Amino acid sequence: MMVMNTELRQDTPQFKRWEAVPQPLDFKVYIFNVTNPYEVQMGRRPRVVEVGPYVYFQYRHKDNIRFSRDRSKVHFSQQQMYVFDAESSYPLTENDQLTVLNMHMNSILQIIDTQAKETITNFRSDVNNTLEKIPVVRVIKRIIEKTTPIQSILQLAEDETYDSLRLINAELNRIFGRPDSMFLRTTPREFLFEGVPFCVNVIGIAKAICKEIEKRNTKTIRVQPDGSMKFSFFNHKNMTNDGTYTINTGIKEPALTQMIEYWNGRNTLDRWINQSAGSSSKCNKIVGTDGSGYPPFREGVERMTIFSSDICRTVDIKYVGPSSYEGIPALRFETDSHFLNEIGPEYGNDCYCVNRIPKAIVKNNGCLYKGALDLSTCFDAPVVLTHPHMMGAAQEYTSLIDGLYPDPEKHQIFVDVEPLTGTPLNGGKRVQFNMFLRRIDSIRLTDRLQTTLFPVLWIEEGIALNEDMVKLIDDSLMKVLTLLDIVQWVMIGSGLLLAIIMPIVYFIKRRPSSGSITPTLTTTTSTVSISDGGGLGGNPQK
């Protein structure tokens, strides 16, 4: 019965709860407000202040559900929707004014810095093609080419990255709206979901650069109907799904319940380094559940695995001890040091060392220092993952910024799991997103910057079962277990009582009556006394 209550069988209460999470998850965002942006521009140490949480309801609903023929697998996608929770966020609002790192400008500049020749060649080609369509320009261009055959009208030292970046530097004001620093004054509404506009009413070279940005198809940037663009950190997650999952229903093998078989039709990723062509490294393996549920009977399990599409990787969580939630016994699991603190060839997982952020603060082997993970290949942007407030990160990063206060109670990833059903009772996925801020040759705004791993925001995505769900588990599981516990002790007590009564009954049934014993005993005694001649009394009578 316990196993059947954890299997994913259609038209059962368990299936309905799996299909639509019966309560919204909490999605909390903490943004790092920069208090000295202009000092940072001058090369000083940044100071940040955490502002949050900005709380959102996260609703999840599975659709496109299809079962395999033998019902052992189920395919689905999961829609997500975010709604601002003004009450839980109070006194903070989505319209608060904050100063944050200008992520999209910083990202675009770093990408152009590393791919300048390719980018410049592409947008020069676009501009040339556009000009060729204008008759007057075409005639003038032909005349210039005849007098200067080595260079066309737009050939500006094509092989020189330096000159290419100078060209881009001249267009920054048109693309990003006259920025006076690498920081942005914005609101949580714009920065997180609605979008920060850029590439508005651009022409010429600026328009060509914006076209190159559009071609990258970065998920945090959306093209608007008028051709302009908007950057937002989480809008790509809103009213969308993160792909198609195929998971085990547990009908044939309960120990595999909710374990992922395929994601988008594959059991491997292509985001991390593979040791050889045609092979897949362990960094690219898709293993575990999606974290919304686990197989039953977790007692004695030392380690579990979660696949997170948000960070394009599998994460191990280890058992750290017993716990409880609202009176329900649980097992607590947390991420271990392999998640962020032990990455590199010495740990056998250097496939995570993608080394895609030039001029970053890295070890000699190209890996980031302890506590940081390069997500460039996951985000298609130079984003770095850490624990909140860079908890556990190397001093090469933490010593360069003021305002970080790591606290395991607030910042550790954890989940409390009910051991018999594998149900998560309470938990939080807590991660921080950062970017390297550094000098880029020929970009004036970056001239005096010191290379720093700069915190942008951290999130806590989690669940704490509400009263209704706690009551459901208490009624359907804990009271049954309590009843079974009572029955067990009644049976033990009954057994002990029987163990005491049965020998007594047996002894009574086996014991002879008193009338049959006395004559025999008397006769025997008299006979012995006479023959011994006085062993028990005086001399025999004469």
UniProtKB/Swiss-Prot annotation:
Membrane topology: Single-pass membrane protein
Tissue specificity field: Detected in the antenna, legs and wings. Higher levels of expression detected in male compared to female.
This protein's GO CC annotations: cytoplasm; plasma membrane
Localization of this protein: Cell membrane
GO annotation (BP), single: sensory perception of smell
GO molecular function: scavenger receptor activity
Residues annotated as transmembrane: 488-508
Cytoplasmic side: 509-542
PANTHER family: SCAVENGER RECEPTOR CLASS B TYPE-1 SR-B1 (PTHR11923), SENSORY NEURON MEMBRANE PROTEIN 2 (PTHR11923:SF109)
Record family assignment: Belongs to the CD36 family.
Protein name: Sensory neuron membrane protein 2
Organism: Aedes aegypti
Record lineage: Eukaryota, Metazoa, Ecdysozoa, Arthropoda, Hexapoda
